[in-house]
């Protein structure tokens, strides 16, 4: 059995029989976890083991574990700062900010891998334009070159323990106020402006080995009337052909309000996959997931399968308890805990 193109969610902290049936469907290739699925590292490890045991090859398990307000697993995990904190440290001490970005990437990945989670949808590559409340302090910085440097450092930390990175939200969500979770989002800039600014972090990260990209549900009417995640112009012509990206393309959640204007859930999934997504997310809408599993017809290619398999990264051999005895991990978590805008006491 291959990994299918759908990533679904589950309701609770353990698998129900309904979950097992859904996740065993050949169209499914992954599971995204939320805060409601988490109680403790031990419980999470049991949950991920049960998900991985359902299929061969195992389903891909993902989470949004960025830091700051977007950190699904908190108690028992290291509290990670919002990425804007690294940008503010960069203004004072660029070398320190890069060091801390690597440390955050390492700790983030080490803890998730220890609990059986394959990938986090991070880093955010959107610019901090002080326009978007939904992005806000999730972004590293206002200048694209600095975003690229900090994101690359964080990716290096992830990769040091076998986790790949997923940059988001292509081609850039930082310059608009609208929140795609609840409304349509339109960016009226021309391609030249977007290419010079927003695409720079994506281009730099692609050139240095970025494995995954998540597309935005944002409309850029000067380029294409469809949102980027439904646009072959963005995903094929620009991302694949112009920027040379060869990794895995994820949609954002197809049940977000900005995506619901594009027909039934089946039509949305078909449009996103035809545009160039390798995997589409269906979250917080069990009825839509059921409908899609019944109605979607999709032939998955060997290239798609290879791209999804690569997102698994390398498996860790360390448990959470073992991590807490490792000198590298102890030092990294101590440094992260001392991050303060007023008093940076970490030495590189």
From Swiss-Prot:
One of its GO terms (biological process) is cell division. It is found in: Cytoplasm. GO terms for cellular component: cytoplasm. Transmembrane segments: none annotated. Its EC number is 3.2.1.52. SUPFAM superfamilies: (Trans)glycosidases. The record marks 179 as: Important for catalytic activity. Keywords: Cell cycle, Cell division, Cell shape, Cell wall biogenesis/degradation, Cytoplasm, Glycosidase, Hydrolase, Peptidoglycan synthesis. Substrate binds at residues 64, 72, 138, 168-169. It is an enzyme of class 3 (hydrolase). Signal peptide: none annotated. GO terms for molecular function: beta-N-acetylhexosaminidase activity. The active site is at 181 (proton donor/acceptor), 252 (nucleophile). PANTHER family: BETA-HEXOSAMINIDASE, BETA-HEXOSAMINIDASE-RELATED. Plays a role in peptidoglycan recycling by cleaving the terminal beta-1,4-linked N-acetylglucosamine (GlcNAc) from peptide-linked peptidoglycan fragments, giving rise to free GlcNAc, anhydro-N-acetylmuramic acid and anhydro-N-acetylmuramic acid-linked peptides. Belongs to the glycosyl hydrolase 3 family. NagZ subfamily. This is Beta-hexosaminidase. The lineage of its organism: Bacteria, Pseudomonadati, Pseudomonadota, Betaproteobacteria, Nitrosomonadales.
């Amino acid at each position: 059995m291959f990994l299918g193109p759908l990533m679904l969610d589950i309701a609770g902290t353990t698998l129900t029989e309904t979950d097992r049936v859904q996740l065993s469907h050949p169209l499914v290739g992954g599971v995204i976890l939320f805060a409601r699925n988490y109680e403790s590292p031990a419980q999470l490890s049991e949950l991920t083991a049960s998900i991985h045991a359902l299929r061969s090859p195992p389903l891909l398990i993902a989470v949004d574990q960025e830091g700051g307000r977007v950190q699904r697993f908190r108690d028992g995990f290291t509290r990670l700062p919002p990425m804007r904190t690294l940008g503010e440290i960069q203004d004072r001490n660029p070398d320190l900010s890069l060091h801390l970005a690597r440390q955050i990437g390492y700790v983030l990945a080490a803890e998730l891998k220890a609990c059986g989670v394959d990938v986090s949808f991070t880093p955010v590559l959107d610019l901090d334009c002080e326009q978007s409340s939904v992005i806000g302090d999730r972004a590293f910085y206002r200048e694209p070159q600095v975003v690229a440097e900090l994101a690359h450092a964080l990716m290096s930390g992830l990769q040091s323990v076998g986790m790949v990175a997923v940059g988001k939200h292509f081609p850039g969500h930082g310059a608009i106020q609208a929140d795609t979770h609840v409304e349509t989002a339109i960016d009226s800039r021309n391609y030249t402006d977007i290419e010079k600014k927003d695409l720079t972090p994506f281009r730099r990260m692609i050139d240095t080995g970025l494995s995954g990209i998540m597309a935005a549900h944002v409309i850029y009417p000067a380029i294409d009337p469809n949102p980027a995640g439904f646009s072959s112009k963005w995903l094929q012509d620009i991302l694949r052909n112009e920027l040379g990206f060869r990794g895995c393309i994820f949609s954002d959640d197809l049940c977000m309000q900005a995506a619901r204007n594009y027909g039934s859930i089946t039509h949305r999934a078909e449009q996103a996959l035809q545009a160039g997504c390798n995997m589409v997310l269906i979250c917080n809408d069990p009825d839509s997931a059921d409908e899609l599993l019944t109605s979607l017809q999709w032939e998955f290619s060997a290239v798609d399968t290879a791209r999804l398999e690569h997102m698994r990264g390398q498996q860790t051999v360390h448990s959470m308890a073992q991590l807490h005895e490792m000198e590298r991990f102890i030092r990294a978590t101590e440094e992260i805990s001392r991050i303060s805008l007023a008093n940076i006491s970490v030495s590189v």
